Amino acid sequence: MKNLFLISAIILLSVCKVSAQKIIPAKDAAKHIGEKVTICDKVCSQSNKAFMVTLFLGGDRPNQLLRVAIRFSDRAKTKGYFDTSFEGKDICVTGVVLNGRDGPYIRVNNPEQIKPLLLDSPVKQIQTLN
């Protein structure tokens, strides 16, 4: 019985650890290459091309702190969600931080990875304190 409790506790802690997300500002993205994180910041500019939508967080291109890349093949499955302009809006994006030639980026495959950052959000309050 004791072993069953111990095994259950270990499994529960493992699941909690896996589901926990780190929330970081765009300026720290380069420190988290290869990690799945949630990054919250302002979209300073947006590039809409036929094959890709790119959001630039933390600064205008080429001085952005993070790029968010949405390929056309993924954009087509989202029924117009990525046709919206995100420029000037505060968002949170969740995904694995990758290292690209222009710095860190996150590839977005579905709209669930991008959420608006609400003004009364605890994350927004933390960012404004820093």
What is the predicted function of each stretch?
Residues L4-S14:
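Sec-dependent N-terminal signal peptides
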